[in-house]
UniProtKB/Swiss-Prot annotation:
Oxidoreductase listed as a keyword: yes
Reaction equation(s) it catalyzes: L-methionyl-[protein] + [thioredoxin]-disulfide + H2O = L-methionyl-(S)-S-oxide-[protein] + [thioredoxin]-dithiol; [thioredoxin]-disulfide + L-methionine + H2O = L-methionine (S)-S-oxide + [thioredoxin]-dithiol
Homology family: Belongs to the MsrA Met sulfoxide reductase family.
Active site: 10
Gene Ontology terms, MF aspect: L-methionine:thioredoxin-disulfide S-oxidoreductase activity; peptide-methionine (S)-S-oxide reductase activity
Single GO biological process annotation from the record: protein modification process
Task performed by this protein: Has an important function as a repair enzyme for proteins that have been inactivated by oxidation. Catalyzes the reversible oxidation-reduction of methionine sulfoxide in proteins to methionine.
Record-linked Pfam families: PMSR
SUPFAM superfamilies the UniProt entry points to: Peptide methionine sulfoxide reductase
Name this protein carries in UniProt: Peptide methionine sulfoxide reductase MsrA
Enzyme kind, highest EC tier: oxidoreductase
Oxidoreductase recorded as keyword: yes
Domain of life: Bacteria
């Protein structure tokens, strides 16, 4: 079992993608990156001034879905070339970031994945950091799309990501 923390825009969207991946045991929306734990809440993080990032903690069975595939899915389902923005979500809280939990095994895989994308001509701006304090987001953010499937923002953003997942990573789709 491995854990990696990913920030690729709104955590509702990234959460929904990884909930659909075979071998993913748990996806938890949360915040990471800020200095003041008291500001790790949706209202303050949305201000873009706390240093926190909307992220998801992905716990996965790497015998079913290897880290390389988790990263490929992550990079395929968000824009890793735009700093502090994913679509209409603008601000440092939406930046592209990977927090690794094991420097010896995960960091080289992350670096290889990013270098592969750069070799393809992409200007990757994704930040890579060792994991530090993860703050679980408020309960109403957990499993958000499954609880709010008709919410307008989700309807506009999540289905295209799931379509890309289905098309490019069919063998890793759950269910």
């Amino acid at each position: 079992m491995q854990t990696i923390i990913l920030g690729g825009g709104c955590f509702w969207c990234t959460e929904s993608v990884f909930q659909s991946v075979k071998g993913v045991q748990k996806v938890t929306s949360g915040y990471m990156g800020g200095e003041d734990a008291n500001l790790a809440n949706y209202k303050d993080v949305c201000s873009g001034t706390t240093g926190h990032i909307e992220v998801v903690r992905v716990d996965f069975d790497d015998t079913i879905v290897p880290l390389e595939v988790v990263l490929d899915i992550f990079f395929a389902t968000h824009d890793p070339t735009t700093r502090d923005r994913q679509g209409n979500d603008i601000g440092s809280q939406y930046r592209s970031v990977v927090f690794y939990t094991d420097e010896e095994t995960q960091k080289p895989t992350i670096d290889r994945t990013i270098n592969k994308l750069r070799d393809m001509g992409l200007d990757i701006v994704t930040e890579v950091h060792p994991v530090h304090e993860f703050h679980v987001a408020e309960d109403y953010h957990q499993d958000y799309f499954n609880k709010n499937p008709t919410q307008g923002y989700c309807q506009a953003v999540i289905p295209p990501k799931l379509g890309k997942l289905r098309k490019e990573f069919k063998q890793y789709m759950a269910k």
